[in-house]
Regions:
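Walker A/P-loop
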Residues: 21-42, 262
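A short beta-strand element within the Helicase C-terminal
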Residues: 114-115, 310-314, 318-335, 340, ...
Length: 394
C-alpha cells in the first residue's frame, strides 16, 4: 500500500490542476517542496495504474543522488534504476532516474506511451539537442523549475512547452514567505566601484554599443559586432578587481553561521577561497569541477558538518542542490541572469531548526547591474522584504 504524506497548501491546490490532464509545468520557488510534490504525483500515478513507469530527468549528478535518496524512502531499491554519474542501467525498472547528458544511452529502452516523464530544473532541456531526445508521445509529463522561462531565447515556447505543457501553477518567493515555507530573508546590494581604468573602458564600450545600435537601427542581438561589444563590456564588469576585496569586507562585517559564495569563474573562486582562509574564524572550501567527485563530496560533507563555514562555487551549486545549513549567500556578480539569481538565492532559504533568517548579498559594479537590481529590490520592498544598499569603504 502506497503511503501519502500530508501536502502543503500550495501542493493541495496544484495537484488537481496537474492530475486533470497529467501534463504541465509547476513553477515553484527553490525550497518550496517541488520534489516532495513530484513524488506525490508519481505515487498517485502508479497507484492509479501499476503497469505504468516513471522516467525522472535531472541536470546533474548531485540531483540524481538527491532524487534517489528521496525515492528510496518511498520505494524498494529494486524498483529504482540510475543512469548517469558512472551508473548506466541496462534494465529499465519501475522508476528510472537519469541525468540529461546520459539519457541518450537509455532513451530507446523507454516506452513513452506508458511512462510519466518528470523533468527537474526543466529549463535545462531547452536546447535543440536535448529537446530532440524527449519529443516522444509521453503518457504524462511533469516539469519542475523555479525558473522555467529562459532569459536569452524563446526555447521555453519552442521546445520546453511542447514537451511538457503549459505552466499550470506558479508559487513564488512572496507566496512561500507568507506561508512560512521558506525563512524570512534580507537583501543587501553592495557597490564595488570600477577602478578608474576599468571605468574608462566601460564608458568606451558603452559609446561603441550606442553607435553600433544607431547604425543598425536598434539593439539586434543577432548582429555579431554588437553582440561582441556587449559581451566584452559584461566581461569587464564581471571581472572588476574590487569585487573580491569588497566581498571579503562584507563577509567579515555581516555575521552568519555559514556562507555560500558564488563567483564568476574558477579563478575568482580560488582567489576568494585563499583570502578567506587567512581570516580568523573562517574555514573555506571550494566546490567546482577542478576537484574530483570525492574531493567535492568531502567539502560538501565538511560544510554540512560545520567544519567549513564558507563554500565557494561558480555554477556547480546553482540548481537543485539542498544546502539548508547555509544562512548567507553572496553573489559576486550581479550580471548573472534572472534565472541564475533566483536559483542562487534559493540555496539559503530552506527552513531548518536553528535558522532565523537568511541574508543574500549581491555585489555590483556598473550602471547596467544597478538598474537591474533596483527593479528587483523595488519588487521585494513592496512585499516587506528588508533591503539595504551600501558601497565599499576600501
Amino acid at each position: 500500500m502506497v503511503t501519502f504524506l500530508k501536502l502543503r497548501e500550495w501542493q493541495e491546490k496544484a495537484f488537481p490542476l496537474w492530475w486533470e490532464k497529467k501534463r504541465g509545468i509547476i513553477k515553484v520557488v527553490t525550497g518550496g517542496g517541488k520534489t516532495f510534490f513530484a513524488i506525490h504525483c508519481l505515487k498517485r500515478y502508479l497507484e492509479n495504474d501499476p503497469q505504468k513507469s516513471i522516467l525522472i530527468v535531472v541536470p546533474s549528478i548531485a540531483l540524481l543522488d538527491q532524487w534517489y535518496d528521496s525515492l528510496s524512502q518511498n520505494f524498494d531499491d529494486k524498483e529504482i534504476s540510475l543512469n548517469g554519474g558512472g551508473e548506466q542501467t541496462k534494465i529499465i525498472t519501475k522508476i528510472c532516474i537519469s541525468t540529461i547528458d546520459s539519457l541518450k544511452n537509455i532513451i530507446s529502452l523507454i516506452d513513452a506511451e506508458k511512462t510519466l516523464l518528470i523533468v527537474d530544473e526543466c529549463h535545462k532541456i531547452g536546447t535543440e539537442k536535448r529537446g530532440e531526445m524527449l519529443t516522444n508521445a509521453w503518457h504524462a509529463t511533469l516539469g519542475l523549475s523555479a525558473t522555467p522561462e529562459r532569459d536569452y531565447d524563446d526555447n521555453f515556447y519552442i521546445i520546453i512547452k511542447k514537451i511538457l505543457g503549459d505552466i499550470i501553477f506558479d508559487y513564488d518567493y512572496i507566496d512561500a514567505r507568507e506561508d512560512e515555507v521558506i525563512v524570512n530573508f534580507k537583501l543587501l546590494y553592495g557597490y564595488a566601484a570600477l577602478l578608474p581604468e576599468e571605468e574608462n573602458k566601460y564608458k568606451k564600450f558603452t559609446k561603441s554599443i550606442q553607435r553600433r545600435a544607431a547604425t543598425i537601427g536598434g539593439q539586434d542581438m543577432n548582429d555579431y559586432p554588437l553582440k561582441m561589444l556587449i559581451f566584452n563590456r559584461a566581461r569587464l564588469v564581471k571581472n572588476s578587481k574590487n569585487r573580491i576585496p569588497y566581498g571579503i569586507e562584507l563577509i567579515q562585517k555581516y555575521e552568519r553561521d555559514s556562507w555560500i559564495v558564488f563567483t564568476e569563474n574558477k579563478k575568482q573562486a580560488k582567489e576568494f577561497n585563499k583570502i578567506v582562509n587567512k581570516l580568523k574564524g573562517f574555514n573555506s572550501g571550494i566546490y567546482n569541477t577542478d576537484l574530483n567527485d570525492d574531493e567535492r563530496q568531502e567539502n560538501l560533507e565538511k560544510f554540512k558538518a560545520g567544519n567549513l563555514n564558507v563554500l565557494v562555487s561558480c555554477t556547480a551549486l546553482d540548481e537543485g542542490f539542498d544546502m539548508p545549513e547555509a544562512d548567507g549567500a553572496m553573489i559576486l556578480s550581479a550580471s548573472s541572469s534572472k534565472r541564475q539569481r533566483i536559483q542562487r538565492m534559493g540555496r539559503v532559504l530552506r527552513i531548518t531548526a536553528n535558522k532565523e533568517n537568511a541574508l543574500i548579498v549581491t555585489v555590483y559594479s556598473s550602471k547596467t547591474e544597478y538598474e537591474k537590481l533596483r527593479e528587483e529590490s523595488n519588487r521585494y520592498k513592496l512585499e516587506g522584504v528588508p533591503v539595504k544598499w551600501q558601497q565599499m569603504s576600501l
